[in-house]
Amino acid sequence: MIVIDRESPNGNAFNILGVAVQLMREKGYTSEQAEAVLEEMKSGDYDNLCSVFEQTFCDDVELI
């Protein structure tokens, strides 16, 4: 399991989006599925981004 500390440099939005892209590739998401997740992540503020990320990748990543 990947652990990302929201208070660390790795906890910034750009890194979290990058981790999401990497995980979606590994899991075989289609382009359409990946785009939908990214759009939802980017549709609000940082807390929304983290919430969608955690809901989507709860088996693979823990945000602390």
What is the predicted function of each stretch?
Residues 1-64:
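Long, contiguous binding/interaction regions
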